[in-house]
Every structure is written in structure tokens, then in C-alpha cells.
């Protein structure tokens, strides 16, 4: 049997690199080769791929998903695309949204076009979207059929790319599968996001900035469980379908902060309440019945254990995050 040649965009980032390390690691499918296409923005980190760099099944192409000619050339040699590349930080999209629209919308459309028009035939396209496309929900959980009501420029750019991806299925018959996951956590997470920011601040004895009263609720998904869900959809999902992927642990930011204070042996003295994020969604909650029933998805990582492991990883890998924090002035 020949290997499936998978093109992973954004594979030098947090989730994409974990996906690549897993695919090429001992628990991977074994019958794949992986090419990462990544622009190496501030969030892309070559060190995230150190574990696989010498693997003969791995290759890396530096470049922008908006570069039509490059994308067509790279896509030509692949059988599947798994698309993570994006501008991903909500706060940055509030400061300036242009890059979000360019990369997340135009970049996705460039890839879809290359997937559709590939010499030798179209290739399946797994689009990694987010639960933020649904907006905010006070009670209950969103099934995949709920309308999209994104609030931040980031979420709106992801909703746009999500819909453009599905349009390539409905219009052209391209095999497009969309996943909408909740908030990921784990190692190698860029230290501007809440969990790694709080852990690294606490490790340094600094205060952590909690938005407003910390009442915003998020569902937390460990990266191992996210990869499990993505692989189920890549290998067994149906073309044209959307699959929610959640972790099953809903916490307010205040509850999350409490757990991180405990892990670091700190108190609420270390917390600074800061002005709330503009347009801050109150609660996200995805209904994962579809992926559970159709593909047998089961999140396995206990949140308390996963958070402790994540805390320990940052404690033990200062050399990974310290330069990133200094460079980004976090
Ligand atoms: P990240 O910011 O850590 O990584 C993004 C990667 O994309 C980086 O390696 C960056 O260099 C690359 N990139 C950015 N612009 C590019 C371009 N124009 N061309 C090529 N590469 C480019 O993001 P992440 O947290 O790993 O998220 C991955 C995907 O998952 C994103 O699509 C994001 O919207 C989605 N997602 C993330 C979360 C989460 O909790 N982190 C939750 C839901 C959905």
C-alpha cells in the first residue's frame, strides 16, 4: 500500500505541530508522509517540529497560504490537505483585523482552489474551524446545524472561511470536511493565550490579568483529544459535513484561574482584574453528539491531569517559552 501524502498548513503552530508530531510518532497511522506549509509568523515556531525534523516521512516548506503559485505547486504532490494555518488570537484581531481576513479567508480560498484544480484530480480538504463561529450561548450547546453568529473579527474571519470551504463542496463537489473545536490546551501553546500566559506569569512570580470578573465560560479540549477527533474525521468523516469537537470540561475563567493558582502555590493576590475584552463572548458550548455517535469520538484526557501536565511542561521547558515572551513583550 502506498503512503497517503498529507499537506498540513500551519504545522509549526500550537495544534498543527502536535498533529504532525502525533501522525509521525509511535501512535500515528504509519502509512502517511507529512509536508508542513507554514509562513512562520510570530506564532509559528520551527522548534515545535524538532521531534520530527529528521524523520524521512517529514518535510517542511516555508511559505504563505495566500501565495497562489506556491500553493498550487505544493498541493500538486499531495493526496489530502489538513488546514490549520490561521491568525488565531482574538485580542490581536481587535487591534487590527486585516491580516485575519487575508490569511483566514483569502488563504483558505487559495488552498481550496488548489485542492479543486490539482492536476491529477481534486484532493480532500479537512478545514479546522472553531466553536467561536457560533457566537455566544447562555444555556445548552450548539449542534452543527445552528446558525453562525460570530462576534470578534477573528471569529468572523473563521466563519467566513468555514462557509467558503463548505461552498466548495456544495458547488464543486470537493471533499471538504469541517471541524469546529472548543478551546485547546496543552504543551507548546504560544504564551499569549490564557493558560500558558497565566502559568508562565505565575512561574515568574508575576500577576495574571483576569478579564472583568472572570465569568466567561469556555469548554477545554486537550490537544491529544483534538488530534483524536481530527483523525476520526480525516479517515472516516463524510464529505460536506461539519463535526463539533469538544473536551467536556466547562469552566469559567475564574475557576480556571483558581486551578492555576493552586498548581503554582499562589493566591488571589497574584490576580489583577483588567478591563474586559471588547465584545467578549460569555459562553461557548459545543454539542458533540454527532462525532460521538457517528465516529466513536471520546475525549480521554481528564482536565485536572491534563492541566497539571501542561503546568509541569512549562515549568520544565523555560527555554522554549522565555524567548517567545521576551520577543512578543508579553
Ligand atoms: P497558532 O497561532 O498557534 O498557529 C498558526 C500557524 O499558522 C503558525 O505556525 C503560523 O506561522 C501559521 N500561519 C499563519 N499565517 C499563515 C499564512 N498566511 N501562511 C502559512 N502559514 C501561516 O494557531 P493554533 O492555536 O495552533 O490554531 C490552529 C487552528 O485551529 C487555527 O485555524 C485556529 O483558528 C483553530 N482553532 C484553534 C483553537 C485553539 O484553542 N488554539 C480553538 C479552535 C480552533
Regions found by a protein language model. Give the residues of each.
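C-terminal substrate-binding subdomain of Rossmann-fold SDR/epimerase-dehydratase oxidoreductases
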Residues: 7, 19-22, 31, 63, ...
Amino acid at each position: 500500500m502506498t503512503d497517503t501524502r498529507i499537506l498540513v498548513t500551519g504545522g509549526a503552530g500550537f495544534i498543527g505541530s502536535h498533529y504532525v508530531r502525533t501522525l509521525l510518532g509511535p501512535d500515528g497511522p504509519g502509512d502517511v508522509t507529512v509536508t508542513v506549509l507554514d509562513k512562520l509568523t510570530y506564532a509559528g515556531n520551527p522548534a515545535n517540529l524538532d521531534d520530527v525534523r529528521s524523520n524521512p516521512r517529514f518535510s517542511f516548506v516555508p511559505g504563505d497560504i495566500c501565495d497562489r503559485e506556491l500553493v498550487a505547486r505544493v498541493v500538486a504532490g499531495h493526496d489530502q490537505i489538513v488546514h490549520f494555518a490561521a491568525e488565531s488570537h482574538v485580542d490581536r484581531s481587535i487591534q487590527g483585523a486585516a491580516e485575519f481576513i487575508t490569511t483566514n479567508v483569502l488563504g483558505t480560498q487559495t488552498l481550496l482552489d488548489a485542492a479543486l484544480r490539482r492536476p491529477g484530480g481534486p484532493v480532500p480538504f479537512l478545514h479546522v474551524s472553531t466553536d467561536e463561529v457560533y457566537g455566544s450561548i447562555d444555556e445548552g450547546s450548539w449542534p452543527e446545524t445552528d446558525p453562525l453568529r460570530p462576534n470578534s473579527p477573528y471569529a468572523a474571519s473563521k466563519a467566513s472561511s468555514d462557509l467558503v470551504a463548505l461552498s466548495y463542496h456544495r458547488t464543486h463537489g470537493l471533499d471538504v470536511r469541517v471541524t469546529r473545536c472548543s478551546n485547546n490546551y496543552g504543551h507548546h501553546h504560544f504564551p499569549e493565550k490564557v493558560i500558558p500566559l497565566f502559568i508562565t506569569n505565575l512561574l515568574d512570580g508575576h500577576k495574571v490579568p483576569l478579564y472583568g470578573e472572570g465569568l466567561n465560560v469556555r469548554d477545554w479540549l486537550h490537544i491529544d483529544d483534538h488530534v483524536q477527533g481530527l483523525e476520526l474525521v480525516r479517515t472516516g468523516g463524510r464529505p460536506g459535513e461539519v463535526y463539533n469537537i469538544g473536551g467536556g470540561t466547562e469552566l469559567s475563567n475564574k475557576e480556571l484561574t483558581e486551578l492555576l493558582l493552586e498548581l503554582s502555590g499562589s493566591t488571589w493576590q497574584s490576580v489583577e482584574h483588567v478591563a474586559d475584552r471588547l465584545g467578549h463572548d460569555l459562553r461557548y458550548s459545543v454539542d458533540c453528539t454527532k462525532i460521538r455517535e457517528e465516529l466513536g469520538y471520546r475525549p480521554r484526557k481528564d482536565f485536572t491531569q491534563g492541566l497539571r501536565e501542561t503546568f509541569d511542561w512549562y515549568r520544565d521547558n523555560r527555554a522554549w517559552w522565555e524567548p517567545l515572551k521576551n520577543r512578543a513583550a508579553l
